[in-house]
Amino acid sequence: MSMFLGTHQNRFDAKGRVSIPASFRAALKSQAQPGDPLVILRPSHLHPCIEGWTVGAFASLATPLDEYDPFSEDHEDLAASLYADAYPLDSDKEGRIILPENLRTHAALTDEVSFMGLGRTFQIWNPEAAAERRQAARSRARTLATSRRPASAPAAGNTAGAAE
C-alpha cells in the first residue's frame, strides 16, 4: 500500500490551482479504481486544515454509519458532517487541483500551502499553522510514547541497572 509521507510546500498559481506533490499523486493513483476521483477533500473536524482521502479510505469512514437507523437524527448529523463538505476532485495533467473556496477559507490558505503526509491520508495546511501543528504533534507524541512504554523496558539511553 502506498503511503502519504513527508511535508511538501507548494504555491497557488495565478488561476488558483495548486499541485499535489508527485509522491502524493502516485499514492493516490495507485489506490484509485477506474472511474474514481483522484482524491476526496474535506475540512478537518479537529484542525484548521483540509483532509485528503483516497476513495477507499474515505469509504471506510462510512462504516460506522451502518450502526445507526438511516432515518434517525444521529445518522443524518453524522452523514451531513461526513459528506456535505466532501469534494471529489481530479487533477489536470500537471497534477494541479482547484480547492473549493470554503475549504481554502477553513484552512486559512493564501499563497502557499503545506501538504502533510499522515500515512493513509494527508492534510493541506497554511504553512505557518502546519509548522505549529507538527511541533505540537511531536511534543505530544513524545509524551504518548513515554507514557505507554512497558514498565520493564528501560527508557532509551537509560542503562541504570543494566548488566555490565
From Swiss-Prot:
Coiled coil: none
Low complexity bias: start-end ranges: 142-164
GO terms (BP aspect): negative regulation of DNA-templated transcription initiation
Pfam families: MraZ
Key words of the record: Cytoplasm, DNA-binding, Repeat, Transcription, Transcription regulation
Domain annotation SpoVT-AbrB: ranges: 7-57, 86-129
Cell membrane as UniProt keyword: no
Protein localization: Cytoplasm, Nucleoid
InterPro entries registered for this protein in UniProt: MraZ, MraZ_C, MraZ_dom, MraZ_N, MraZ_sf, SpoVT-AbrB_dom, SpoVT-AbrB_sf
Stretches for region Disordered: 133-164
GO cellular component annotations of the record: cytoplasm; nucleoid
Molecular function in Gene Ontology: DNA-binding transcription factor activity; transcription cis-regulatory region binding
Family note: Belongs to the MraZ family.
Subunit architecture: Forms oligomers.
Protein name (Swiss-Prot/TrEMBL): Transcriptional regulator MraZ
Species per Swiss-Prot/TrEMBL record: Gluconobacter oxydans (strain 621H)
